[in-house]
Amino acid sequence: MTWETVIGLEIHVQLNTKSKIFSGASTAFGAEPNAHASVVECALPGVLPVMNREVVEKAIKLGLALDAKINRKNVFDRKNYFYPDLPKGYQISQLDLPIVEHGKLEIVVGDDVKTINVTRAHMEEDAGKSVHEGLNGATGIDLNRAGTPLLEVVSEPELRSAAEAVAYAKALHSLVTWLDICDGNMAEGSFRVDANVSVRPKGQAEFGTRREIKNLNSFRFLEQAINYEAEAQIEILEDGSKVQQATMLFDPEKGETRVMRLKEDAQDYRYFPDPDLLPVIISDAQMQKAKAEMPELPKEMAARFVADYGVSEYDARLLTASRAQAAYFEEAAKASGQGKPTANWMNGELAAALNKAGLELADSPITAPRLAALVGKIADGTLSSKLAKKAFEAMWAEPESTIAEIIEKHGLQQMTDTGAVEAMVDEVLANNAKAVEQFKSGNEKALNAIVGQVMKASKGKANPAQVQELIKAKLA
């Protein structure tokens, strides 16, 4: 039997506000335990929550970017459950009236483009965390994270593989960082993924029983967890047993999922409207303000890069993976007047160098103006492609040097003396009679061998195109 995997993702996006969703306490990461726990998070008697306006504004921006319906009336609900890191005994969330509904997000997997529907995105507060390390067998409670504003973004169960799930998570991660509503730091818990996974026979319309894998904080873990869980469910079904609905944990060391608890449903949490919070009504002025503050979105910018700079759609997608990358490209392409070559250098040599050094683009020793200068020297014939790679390496190692200084210091300027190049061509032709005869007999590969010999003789400084033209003219 052929099985189909069905996946829906619930992604917790931590909003990058300075204060918490219902109090003025700081959201800064890394403080001493409970340093940022206010009386609201500690649930002291008589305290009341006060809504953070910025949370609503950031949620609206995500809704606009997802081309979603934005509900003007927002009601908060209490999600009731007991856990030590939740002193109130309930989490403030949204059940029936989420701020964002019916959005969509485009993903790319290989050569395929697919649109995934986004069911909803709702505002809620984060819980605290239990601390087990360094307490001699005891468990401590850290409420610094409690009350941190979240948007829980829920997809439709339209993802059909781990690769699609990772592509969706990466697309949403790129979007929320692009909008500057989340810092996207997965190691610090700013972007956490829960994956709902089920399997069914290929062609069956009815969904199988799903199991939810909680708190996946890397794209690699997301892929591994889904693949393992799908195989585990298939094995259960092929053995004649039934999959039990459950909440799962992923063990990255063993690369496997395990049951944390049997899955609860919404009725188990006994949701009801929070009586301490009035409905939040989004005004026309707030909507207009959010629309005015929206940046050019990645898809729109990618289309513009194709139209204005002549780059391929594939390159445009890479260049718009982040706002920093897009800004770098546009600055360099405008300065050099060479869109496609700039894209090639960014997605090729520069990306490889950054990856090897473990650096972000912002820390690159080759800034956008320096890359533009390099590309410009290739365009005006000063550097051949081979010499340009040597110049790039020197620029990386010598961040204070200009391209002109590097070319002079390392003797990288392409030969412009036609007579000298012609003399080298004549000498190579005289010494490679066999290759000459092969070319005259119609063997085009022989031409490449002759060009290679001339380039070797010139120490890479001759212009390959010029050399090829001279050879063809002499052997015509």
From Swiss-Prot:
Top EC category: ligase
Domain of life: Bacteria
A Pfam family this chain is assigned to: GatB_N
Entry keywords, A to Z: ATP-binding, Ligase, Nucleotide-binding, Protein biosynthesis
MF (Gene Ontology): asparaginyl-tRNA synthase (glutamine-hydrolyzing) activity; ATP binding; glutaminyl-tRNA synthase (glutamine-hydrolyzing) activity
Entry EC number(s): 6.3.5.-
Catalytic activity: L-glutamyl-tRNA(Gln) + L-glutamine + ATP + H2O = L-glutaminyl-tRNA(Gln) + L-glutamate + ADP + phosphate + H(+); L-aspartyl-tRNA(Asn) + L-glutamine + ATP + H2O = L-asparaginyl-tRNA(Asn) + L-glutamate + ADP + phosphate + 2 H(+)
Disulfide bridge partners, by residue number: none
Membrane-spanning segments: none
GO biological process annotation, one example: translation
InterPro entries with a match to the protein in the record: Asn/Gln-tRNA_amidoTrfase_suB/E, Asn/Gln-tRNA_Trfase_suB/E_cat, Asn/Gln_amidotransferase, Asn/Gln_tRNA_amidoTrase-B-like, GatB, GatB_C_1, GatB_Yqey_C_2, Gln-tRNA_amidoTrfase_suB_CS
Keyword Flavoprotein: no
Family statement: Belongs to the GatB/GatE family. GatB subfamily.
PANTHER family: GLUTAMYL-TRNA GLN AMIDOTRANSFERASE SUBUNIT B MITOCHONDRIAL AND PROKARYOTIC PET112-RELATED, GLUTAMYL-TRNA(GLN) AMIDOTRANSFERASE SUBUNIT B, MITOCHONDRIAL
Subunit details: Heterotrimer of A, B and C subunits.
Its job: Allows the formation of correctly charged Asn-tRNA(Asn) or Gln-tRNA(Gln) through the transamidation of misacylated Asp-tRNA(Asn) or Glu-tRNA(Gln) in organisms which lack either or both of asparaginyl-tRNA or glutaminyl-tRNA synthetases. The reaction takes place in the presence of glutamine and ATP through an activated phospho-Asp-tRNA(Asn) or phospho-Glu-tRNA(Gln).
NCBIfam families listed in its UniProt record: gatB, PRK05477.1-2, PRK05477.1-4, PRK05477.1-5
The protein, known as: Aspartyl/glutamyl-tRNA(Asn/Gln) amidotransferase subunit B
Organism: Neisseria meningitidis serogroup C / serotype 2a (strain ATCC 700532 / DSM 15464 / FAM18)
